[in-house]
Every structure is written in C-alpha cells, then in structure tokens.
C-alpha cells in the first residue's frame, strides 16, 4: 500500500456522502481540522437522481421534527428550500390527506399547535445539504471507494481507511492508506462493519429485524395547477389491503405517485394501473385530478425486504476510532417517512458525544454514541414494528408478546381519530416525532378516545333497535 496522508490526530473520515454522511461531516467539521468524505458515486452539481441511491426516485418528505433538526444543523436550509419552490405544510387544513392503517384521519381543520413540514424531492434535499457541506473550509468530498478501515491490533483501534486505486482490482499493495483519528461508517444498509468487527476479533452485533417485504413502484407526473389543494396525499396499507400509495408535490411543480405493497404484495407497474389503484383507495376528487395527469419519464422500482436495527449498543467491546451512523445502525420502514428525522437526531447525539469527550479529555466515543442512538431508536422502532405486525402482516425477531394487543388497541384509537380532530392532531404530531418519540397517549387522550368510540357504539346500538317500518301492499 502507498504512504500515509494527513495527521491522524486531526483528521476525520466519513464513508459515504449520503444524507447521513453529510450530517456527520457537518458535525465533525466543528471538532476536527480536516474532514474527508469518501463517496464511490459521481456526485451531480445540481439536483439529480443517483444510481447508488435507488430510493431517491420515490416519495420523500421532511417531517416537522426532522425539519427543525436539519435547520439547526444547516442554518438557513428551510428558507433556501422554500425559496427554491419546495412546498411547505403549515397548520392549514388543505395541506394533507392522511390515510393510516385503513383509517382516514380527521386532519381537515386548522391545527391548534404549530406544525410545519416540507416536501423536497430527495435529490433536491441532498443537493442542498451537499452544497452547504462543500462550503465548509475544512471539509472535502472525494470520489474514491473505501475498501475497508485499517485496524491496528496492538492499539485495538481503527487508524484510517484503505482506498481502492483505479485499476488495482484485488491488488492490496496498490491500495492507498489514509490516516484518520476517527472513521464514521455512513455506508447505509450495505455497511460491512459487522463483517469487519469479526475480522478484527470482536463480536458481530445482534440484529433486530422486521420482515415487511415492501416493493415500490413510482411515476412522476404533472397536472394543471389547482386541481389538488393538498400537497401530501397518503393512503397507507392496512391489514385488509396490502397495497398503499402516496402522492407528493415537489419543488418544480412535478408530482410523484408512489405505490407500494407490503407482505410481498406487488404494486402496479404502469402509470395507468397506478391510477386504477388510486381510484380504489382515494376519494373521487383525487382520481378526477389524476385523470388529467401527464406522466413524465419511466416508472421506477425499488424493494425494501426488512427493517433492521444492528444492536451496537449491546456489545461489551467495540474498537476505538470508528463509529456507525445512519442506516448503518438502523433502517426503518420507509413508508412511515421517519428515517431522515432519525438521522438528524443521531447527528445531535454525535455532537454531544464529541463535546463530552473533549470536555473530559477522555471517554469512549463509540459507546456513548451507540447508547444515545439506542435511546432514541427504541421508541420509534417499537412504534414501527407494532404497526407493521398489526397492519402489514410483518414478522419480527424478537417479537414481544404485548405488541399485537397494543396494535389492536391502537387500531381503535385511529378509528376514533377519523372524526375527532384532537386525536388526529395528537397522532400527526407523535407520528412526526414532534412532542415525544413515544406513541403513548396520556390518560386524557385515552379517555377521549374511549369516550368517542363509546358514543359511536351507543349510536350503532340505537340504530339497530329502531323498528323497521314496512308499507303493506294494498
């Protein structure tokens, strides 16, 4: 291998220029003299789809909590996105149509509390973040493939990364070594860190999984302005309907229609068939608008077999000099739209862990980050898993016995939220991770849901007891 580059005590390396990698680089820039992000893909200078990010062709939005966290990390981001035409969802009743688990929530009113979310396309959001990172004087993004981190057995730490030299193939002697004080693995779901750990003499992390079997099919389209007032339209899959869809309006006036199937159900592959599914799942005003839609380009397809949480927080030993980040730790059911928000929360954990280490001049950075990440991952993972098991025919490992009964109770809550705007707003805020990461209603909220469902039940009983009058024939 070729010689060392850089001072290992003042250099951080990030593997991958995904949204997670860009967030990590932004945090690291405040603690290291030099930050290098290595990305195998050629990065576009303007918003554009990337071959190594197949999910960027499908429905994306920035939840309210995620918007707050991203704007804190990248000041001015939200202002610039709106200036570029990114739709902003506010407290108005005409912004969102939300169908969840077979229930259409009563969101057709002005929300009592502030709620602001944004609808950038994934390529636009990545471009906004990337250009901000590139403006940092101590950060560079380099197009190179990291073959693996370099582990020093005597020190029991990662001391840098090995880069694949063009045309080197399997020639390890031609790999280039880049020294680093810290390596952040933001390589996404395809991370090889569990394999590297076993090669270095450490245990592989246990994995919690939810086998959901999601398949996507998406198509962009245009419609005349004003046909649809809402900027977000969602009809989620349910226990009795394994197909769902979402429609979003993006920054350039283009819409995307994403259809998906759970439990290995296949979504419709053509735009006409997607519209036919919309006819089945959405009110007539949406399908009338789709009848005037002009499709753009070709459909895009993607698969997401399982949600996965690598439990680095449970490892007793972990090498120094490397930390996992983003989807390399936990990847969530993308139909819930919470993955980017969870990454932004982890960026905050990374910042606090680095501050704590600098203040104490010691400490285990990886252990602190892994513990903090687990604390915020657990409630969202649990909420996702209960929903998938209860409504999407998923299987999970491990599977606590109380998850299915909890899902049944929450189904009743969603039923009440169809016509109770207070319950609908509570769900929308918790689902957006605003007020709490835990989807656990307070006693007053539970009482409101019970009272609401009881009134509906009593009304049904009265209607059943009413005598049916029939007219006698002359």
Curated annotation (Swiss-Prot):
Propeptide feature ranges: 1-4
InterPro entries: FAD/NAD-bd_sf
Gene3D superfamilies per record: FAD/NAD(P)-binding domain
One annotated GO biological process: thiazole biosynthetic process
Domain of life, per lineage: Bacteria
GO CC list: cytosol; peptidoglycan-based cell wall; plasma membrane
Any one GO MF annotation of this record: iron ion binding
TM stretches of this protein: none
Name listed for the protein in its UniProt record: Protein Rv3254
């Amino acid at each position: 291998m070729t010689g060392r580059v850089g001072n290992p005590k003042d250099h951080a390396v990030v593997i991958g220029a995904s949204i997670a990698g860009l967030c990590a680089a932004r945090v690291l820039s405040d603690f290291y003299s030099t930050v290098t992000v290595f990305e195998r893909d050629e990065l576009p200078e303007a918003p554009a789809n990337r071959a190594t990010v197949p999910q960027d062709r499908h429905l994306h939005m920035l939840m309210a909590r995620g918007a707050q966290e991203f704007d804190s990390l990248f000041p001015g981001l939200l202002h610039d996105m709106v200036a570029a035409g990114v739709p902003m969802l506010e407290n108005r009743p005409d912004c969102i149509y939300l169908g969840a688990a077979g229930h259409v929530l009563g969101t057709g009113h002005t929300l009592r509390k502030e709620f602001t979310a944004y609808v950038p396309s994934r390529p636009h959001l990545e471009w906004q973040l990337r250009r901000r990172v590139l403006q940092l004087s101590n950060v560079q993004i380099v197009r190179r493939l990291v073959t693996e981190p370099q582990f020093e057995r005597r020190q029991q730490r990662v001391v840098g990364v090995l880069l694949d030299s063009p045309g080197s193939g399997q020639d390890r002697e031609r790999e280039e070594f880049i020294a680093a004080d810290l390596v952040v693995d933001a390589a996404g779901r395809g991370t090889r860190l569990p394999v590297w750990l076993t090669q270095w003499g450490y245990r592989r992390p246990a994995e919690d999984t939810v086998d959901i079997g999601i398949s996507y099919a998406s198509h962009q389209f245009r419609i005349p302005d004003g046909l649809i007032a809402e900027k977000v339209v969602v009809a989620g899959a349910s226990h009795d309907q394994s197909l769902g869809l979402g429609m979003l309006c993006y920054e350039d006036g283009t819409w995307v229609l994403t259809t998906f199937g759970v439990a290995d159900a296949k979504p419709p592959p053509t735009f006409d068939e997607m519209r036919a599914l919309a006819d089945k799942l959405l009110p007539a005003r949406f399908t009338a608008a789709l009848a005037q839609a002009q499709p753009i380009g070709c459909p895009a397809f993607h698969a997401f077999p399982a949600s996965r949480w690598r439990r680095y927080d449970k490892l007793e030993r972990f090498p120094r000099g490397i930390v996992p980040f983003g989807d390399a730790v936990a990847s969530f059911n993308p139909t819930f739209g919470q993955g980017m928000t969870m990454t932004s929360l982890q960026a905050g954990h990374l910042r606090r862990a680095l501050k704590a280490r600098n203040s104490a001049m010691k400490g285990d950075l990886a252990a602190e980050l892994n513990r903090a990440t687990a604390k915020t991952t657990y409630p969202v993972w649990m909420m996702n898993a209960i929903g998938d098991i209860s409504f999407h025919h998923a299987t999970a490992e491990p599977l606590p016995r109380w998850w299915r009964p909890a899902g049944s109770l929450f189904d009743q809550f969603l039923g009440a939220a169809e016509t109770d705007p207070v319950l609908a707003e509570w769900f929308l805020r918790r689902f957006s991770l605003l007020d709490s990461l835990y989807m656990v209603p307070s006693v007053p909220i539970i009482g409101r849901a019970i009272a609401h469902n009881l009134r509906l039940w009593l009304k049904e009983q009265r209607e059943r007891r009413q005598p049916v009058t029939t007219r006698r024939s002359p």
